[in-house]
Curated annotation (Swiss-Prot):
The lineage of its organism: Eukaryota, Fungi, Dikarya, Ascomycota, Saccharomycotina. This is Large ribosomal subunit protein uL24B. It comes from Saccharomyces cerevisiae (strain ATCC 204508 / S288c) (Baker's yeast). Component of the ribosome, a large ribonucleoprotein complex responsible for the synthesis of proteins in the cell. The small ribosomal subunit (SSU) binds messenger RNAs (mRNAs) and translates the encoded message by selecting cognate aminoacyl-transfer RNA (tRNA) molecules. The large subunit (LSU) contains the ribosomal catalytic site termed the peptidyl transferase center (PTC), which catalyzes the formation of peptide bonds, thereby polymerizing the amino acids delivered by tRNAs into a polypeptide chain. GO terms for cellular component: cytosol; cytosolic large ribosomal subunit. It comes from the Eukaryota. Keywords: Cytoplasm, Ribonucleoprotein, Ribosomal protein. It is found in: Cytoplasm. One of its GO terms (biological process) is cytoplasmic translation. Component of the large ribosomal subunit (LSU). Mature yeast ribosomes consist of a small (40S) and a large (60S) subunit. The 40S small subunit contains 1 molecule of ribosomal RNA (18S rRNA) and 33 different proteins (encoded by 57 genes). The large 60S subunit contains 3 rRNA molecules (25S, 5.8S and 5S rRNA) and 46 different proteins (encoded by 81 genes). Present with 33200 molecules/cell in log phase SD medium. There are 2 genes for uL24 in yeast.
């Protein structure tokens, strides 16, 4: 099948360069996670940029099935940390694990006026 738009490059090298050199404002959108089936039905949207205090479920990787609240979003590393998803160091200390938001599902949204405005702007519904 031919390319739909000639304005968009399908060159892998250019796509990777755009991803890894993206400014923080674009990384926010790149760090989006899908909503759970219940939230998707409730709000009428499929995914949202992840933020602190959202509750998530890990759906891929060795920590699959664990739940927790987002404690930090590290845009520079394309990573988020979930407060209950940690690993034990040899000395007994526990350290948070960096996860990519595409491997998470948002189970509870942290709603404030800006988040509500974003949902409405995306064409979603609020209760």
């Amino acid at each position: 099948m031919a390319k739909q738009s000639l304005d968009v490059s399908s060159d892998r090298r250019k796509a990777r360069k755009a991803y890894f050199t993206a400014p923080s404002s674009e990384r926010r959108v790149l760090l989006s996670a899908p909503l759970s089936k219940e939230l998707r039905a409730q709000y009428g949207i499929k995914a949202l940029p992840i933020r602190r205090d959202d509750e998530v479920l890990v759906v891929r990787g060795s920590k699959k099935g664990q739940e927790g609240k987002i404690s930090s979003v590290y845009r520079l590393k394309f990573a988020v940390q979930v407060d209950k998803v940690t690993k034990e160091k040899v000395n007994g200390a526990s350290v948070p694990i960096n996860l990519h938001p595409s491997k998470l599902v948002i189970t509870k949204l942290h709603l404030d006026k800006d988040r509500k405005a974003l949902i409405q702007r995306k064409g979603g519904k609020l209760e």
